[in-house]
Amino acid sequence: METSKEKTITSPGPYIVRLLNSSLNGCEFPLLTGRTLFVVGQSDALTASGQLPDIPADSFFIPLDHGGVNFEIQVDTDATEIILHELKEGNSESRSVQLNTPIQVGELLILIRPESEPWVPEQPEKLETSAKKNEPRFKNGIVAALAGFFILGIGTVGTLWILNSPQRQAAELDSLLGQEKERFQVLPGRDKMLYVAAQNERDTLWARQVLARGDYDKNARVINENEENKRISIWLDTYYPQLAYYRIHFDEPRKPVFWLSRQRNTMSKKELEVLSQKLRALMPYADSVNITLMDDVTAAGQAEAGLKQQALPYSRRNHKGGVTFVIQGALDDVEILRARQFVDSYYRTWGGRYVQFAIELKDDWLKGRSFQYGAEGYIKMSPGHWYFPSPL
């Protein structure tokens, strides 16, 4: 078994997985940033219970009569490391892999290569031995492959399934985004849609223009954190009008985190689980939605600490269900900009449902009167009228 400890990948992504044995010998699968699941085993075992298993959209099935081990391949966002997780019964094993080097997972032999580089066979003796070892098991390999894909409900031959799979469509969309694709995540959804997760409004607009001008004919939708929060907030306000929550975080779009108030939450554990499933249904690209309880004291404390750090004058007003910080005074343009930047940053973390900010500007009644010289200077208000700022 391959046990390389090499962790630095110098070849640019994206990457391709090539099968070196089994009935799908020679088939290749695209690897996107994030997780890709490979289900390996006998075709009839999948339907032994009388119904099809629930397999994630970002996964592939590889028919193998003996020695099948499910595994995941994880590609870092910066593509500096590729990790293979063997999902054995009772435990899992993880290891980093090298490019263009045969890797054995159970009885399956695979190879990972950059998409931009051709396949270069290595260790021919190992490949030949493995091929002979598996030859009797896959004499009718084409039939086994077609049966496996039919059982999964694809309704077509294996090659067409690969070409039309959500993973392949995601790879096409990833390619359409070109050199800017690092700013986005392409997520296959359970509703047969592809979702492009953008980081901000500018990237959202850019990606939508690319889809509109390109020749991509599949169903795709560009999303971002702010728009998704607004969309889901409308649903929550309709079906959970009394729910005390902050916002949803999409640091990992496949596993969003929903922040609820610890002090104002009255839902039981079972009710929270039901809510999590409903939120997951609203986000077809999400594998799960984690609900986290946050302290109201922490939310208000971070707001107040931030105002003090920015040296902004404010007053605090506590009221039922929230806190309002009023930023007030004769603020100049720099202070106003600093206040707005802080408020925007706070809302991106906590939302604006519990802590709110208001700005009350006051005119500087000394503006344009005269000049003050030194700490003990004075201001000439009018002929015969002098103003000495305190302290004297």
From Swiss-Prot:
It is a single-pass membrane protein. It is found in: Cell membrane. GO terms for cellular component: plasma membrane. InterPro entries: T3SS_PrgH/EprH, T3SS_PrgH/EprH-like. The chain crosses the membrane at residues 142-162. It comes from the Bacteria. Disulfide bonds: none annotated. The keyword Phosphoprotein does not apply. Keywords: Cell membrane, Membrane, Transmembrane, Transmembrane helix, Virulence. Its main location: membrane. NCBIfam families: PrgH (TIGR02554), PRK15327.1 (NF011855). Required for invasion of epithelial cells. This is Protein PrgH. The gene is prgH.
